[in-house]
Amino acid sequence: MLIVGSPVSPYVRKILAILHLKGLEYELDPITPFYGNDEFSKLSPLRRIPVLIDGDLVVNDSTVIAEYLDEAYPDVPVLPKGARERAQSRWIEEYADSRLGDLCIWGLFFPKIVAPHVFKRPPDEDALAKVTDGDLPEALDWIEGRAPAEDFLFGDRIGVADLAVACPLRNAAIAGWTPDPARWPRTAAWLARIATLPCYTRTMAFEPAILATRADGRRAALEAAGVKVAETSFGTDTPRASIMLR
């Protein structure tokens, strides 16, 4: 099984945590979509990550991948059992992927971390302030109303909805923003519980190999962190904007 995508992406991080939780072996091609080659465009027509390749099957979109993994490898489920709970889980995941992902990635992580290095574009401080002072707190108010007082959203085992919330907020933390425990105590405690789980902490151990390592040393750094890096890559040396940035 091959996962195409950088482990710093919240959507890739979500899938890697699920693979770790399920005990599934995988190889990783740790590209960002901005450095995907023409073959990557064929795999992912929206030039988004992650992409899962399982034999001759290609699956795009982290939500679709998570559901495929739960159906194909059901021993350790990440979706709840009942129809009502599954619907709730899917909605929370959608909110996290869409709203939190938009704010944490495109509102914070991309302008502060990615754009200055890849596209030599300085951040717009007014736009950042709108996210950190208005939009993101509003989203966290909604999350706080649904955060579990103990354990996880659907019982004593972590699921995909928990990971969907935690993963983009991890990128916000890398960009310098974390939820204030005084304002969002349930959310902060819930995120802290998630951060202690081996399936999740293992993904965090991959971050320095991407964020603090030169491109020519990342393969060795990832392998030192326990990643089986794919022999061939869908990456290229020249960045290009994704469809979402055009």
Could you describe each region identified by the protein language model?
Residues 207-246:
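Acidic/histidine-enriched, glycine/proline-rich intrinsically disordered or flexible terminal extensions
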Residues 73, 147-150, 198, 207:
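A general structural signal marking secondary-structure boundaries and capping sites
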Residues 96-196:
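GST-like fold's C-terminal all-alpha helical module
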Residues 1-130, 233-246:
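GST-like domain detector, emphasizing the conserved glutathione-binding G-site
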Residues 31-34, 185, 207-208:
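Residue-level "edge-of-site" marker
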Residues 132, 136, 196-213:
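Charged/polar, low-hydrophobicity segments characteristic of intrinsically disordered regions
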